[in-house]
Amino acid sequence: MLCCMRRTKQVEKNDDDQKIEQDGIKPEDKAHKAATKIQASFRGHITRKKLKGEKKDDVQAAEAEANKKDEAPVADGVEKKGEGTTTAEAAPATGSKPDEPGKAGETPSEEKKGEGDAATEQAAPQAPASSEEKAGSAETESATKASTDNSPSSKAEDAPAKEEPKQADVPAAVTAAAATTPAAEDAAAKATAQPPTETGESSQAEENIEAVDETKPKESARQDEGKEEEPEADQEHA
């Protein structure tokens, strides 16, 4: 084995020597070249990283600038929209001004409606009040009529109507009845002139009835006296 190893080593050395002779380059030089290559590649790698970082920074800066540019048109659009809304709001505000006269014109009509409603409301209570007053006046009139119908004046008027046939036969009795009836009529007129009340009417009716009852005997006595005076007058004429 050792013999084989030695032989192979010698062969390899011989091969290396032959290559060196052919190339004319020593192994040290090859190593130096390889080191320089490695260093160069490493430097290149570093520079590439730097370039990439710079590029990234440049890319980021470019992206930021692009974003700013994009944001600027958006802001302009927003401002334009805000201006559009302000103009739209100003337009309705200006449009509402001509409507204000219409509203002002509507307010008098509304006031008129309110006055009309108030007038109707006032007329509604007045109408029942007037109807109540009419009913009260009708009741008072009916009461006065009933009192006048039941008053002694009517009875006094009926009494002279009944006595008219007797007075036609006795002229002297007519004068006596004429003298007595005005007093009864005056009493009846006074009784009717007074305001009718429930208690007053009853008392006055009783007084008038008593007065009529008192006047009837007087009238009959005067009629008898008139009858007695008639023959005496006839005798005197004869």
Curated annotation (Swiss-Prot):
Compartment list: Cell membrane; Cell projection, Growth cone membrane; Synapse; Cell projection, Filopodium membrane
Modified residues (Phosphothreonine): T181
Membrane topology label: Peripheral membrane protein
Keyword Phosphoprotein part of the UniProt annotation: yes
Main location: membrane
Chain intervals for the UniProt region annotation (Disordered): 1-238
Keyword Disulfide bond: no
InterPro entries for this protein: IQ_motif_EF-hand-BS (IPR000048), Neuromodulin (IPR001422), Neuromodulin_C (IPR017454), Neuromodulin_gap-junction_N (IPR018947), Neuromodulin_P_site (IPR033137), Neuromodulin_palmitoyl_site (IPR018243)
One Pfam family matching this protein: Neuromodulin_N
Matching CDD domains: IQCD
Comp. bias intervals (Acidic residues): 226-238
Biological processes per GO annotation: astrocyte differentiation; axon choice point recognition; axon regeneration; cell fate commitment; phospholipase C-activating G protein-coupled receptor signaling pathway; radial glial cell differentiation; regulation of filopodium assembly; regulation of growth
GO annotations of cellular component type: cytoplasm; dendrite; filopodium membrane; GABA-ergic synapse; growth cone membrane; perikaryon; plasma membrane; postsynaptic density
Domain IQ: 31-60
Processing and modification events after translation: Phosphorylated. Phosphorylation of this protein by a protein kinase C is specifically correlated with certain forms of synaptic plasticity.
Lipidation positions, renumbered (S-palmitoyl cysteine): C3, C4
Compositional bias of kind Basic and acidic residues: 9-32, 54-83, 97-116, 155-167, 213-225
A molecular-function term among this protein's GO annotations: lysophosphatidic acid binding
Compositional bias per record (Polar residues), positions renumbered to this chain: 139-154
Biased composition (Low complexity): 84-95, 119-130, 168-199
Residue ranges that the Swiss-Prot or TrEMBL entry lists as coiled coil: none
Chain positions found as Phosphoserine: S41, S151, S153, S154, S202, S203
Family named by the database record: Belongs to the neuromodulin family.
Assembly notes: Identified in a complex containing FGFR4, NCAM1, CDH2, PLCG1, FRS2, SRC, SHC1, GAP43 and CTTN. Interacts (via IQ domain) with calmodulin. Binds calmodulin with a greater affinity in the absence of Ca(2+) than in its presence.
Reported function: This protein is associated with nerve growth. It is a major component of the motile 'growth cones' that form the tips of elongating axons. Plays a role in axonal and dendritic filopodia induction.
Stated name of the protein: Neuromodulin
Gene name as annotated: GAP43
